[in-house]
């Protein structure tokens, strides 16, 4: 797992924060300077936090536990959903339903309903319903798939969540905190880094910044999964 270089972080615009008037003073330790009214993030601190977060995520993945990816802002959705799929981890990129984790039993019931509808449509077991009812079912399944598709295979609460933009995803942050689930997050200059366990100071609005940080998180998870698989094979022999 190779950490991005200073120049790579710079090229990805990771250092660009928000206007000074929007800053959160608790981000002071991660800010390098102010330039033309905009706070610039200290990329050396970003690199330190990245490495710390990566090592922790690697160990979680190595232990066989699930890590949920959360990013519902438009510029992050595709990046994060593809990243999560690449390591077979759950994700939420459309809308965070209240109680996604704190009311997990209800969410599982909704997922079960979605899967039942999908099975029924796939099997063609729809002879007893009208075309209008069939259309309604199809639309309901599509709507549920958009919101719940990323957690369809999540049978227990995740052990950690990786979040892009903790202001936007404050519900996810709050639920994770209430349940004692470890939080890893990209934290911009307008946010409170103390709200998460592993803050990564970074521009959470730029797609390039989101991609480079998310990619490193995925590489850490992949490394953990590979080490886990190697240990399982060794034990089997």
Where does each model-flagged region fall?
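Long, charge-patterned amphipathic alpha-helical coiled-coil/hairpin "stalk" segments used as oligomerization
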Residues: 87, 92-194
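A generic "alpha-helical surface" signal
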Residues: 48, 135, 208-212
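Residue-level signature of catalytic and energy-coupling elements of molecular machines
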Residues: 13, 69, 161, 213
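Glycine-/small-residue-rich active-site loops that bind phosphorylated ligands and cofactors
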Residues: 75-76, 168, 205
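N-terminal cationic and glycine-rich segments that engage phosphates or anionic surfaces
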Residues: 1-66, 72-73, 77-120, 131-134, ...
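Short His-Asn-centered micro-motif
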Residues: 70-73, 163-165
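Short glycine/threonine-rich loop/turn motifs
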Residues: 171-226
């Amino acid at each position: 797992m190779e950490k991005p270089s200073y120049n790579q972080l710079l090229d990805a615009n990771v250092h660009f924060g928000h206007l000074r008037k929007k800053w959160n003073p608790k981000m002071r330790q991660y800010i390098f300077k102010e330039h033309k009214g905009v706070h610039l993030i200290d990329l050396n601190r970003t690199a330190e936090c990245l490495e710390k977060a990566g090592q922790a995520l690697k160990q979680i993945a190595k232990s066989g536990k699930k890590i949920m990816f959360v990013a519902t802002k438009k510029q992050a959705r595709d990046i994060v959903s593809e990243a999560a799929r690449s390591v077979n981890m759950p994700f939420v990129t459309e809308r965070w339903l209240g109680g996604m984790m704190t009311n997990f039993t209800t969410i599982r019931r909704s997922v079960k309903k979605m899967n039942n509808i999908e099975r029924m449509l796939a099997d063609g077991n729809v002879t007893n319903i009208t075309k209008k009812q069939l259309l309604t079912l199809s639309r309901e399944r599509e709507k549920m798939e958009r919101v719940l598709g990323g957690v369809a295979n999540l049978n227990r609460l995740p052990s950690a969540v990786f979040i892009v933009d903790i202001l936007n995803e404050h519900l996810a942050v709050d639920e994770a905190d209430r349940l004692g689930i470890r939080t890893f997050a990209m934290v911009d200059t307008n946010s409170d880094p103390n709200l998460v366990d592993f803050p990564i100071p970074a521009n959470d609005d730029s797609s390039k910044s989101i991609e480079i940080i998310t990619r490193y998180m995925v590489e850490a998870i992949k490394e953990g999964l590979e080490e886990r698989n190697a240990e399982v094979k060794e034990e089997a022999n």
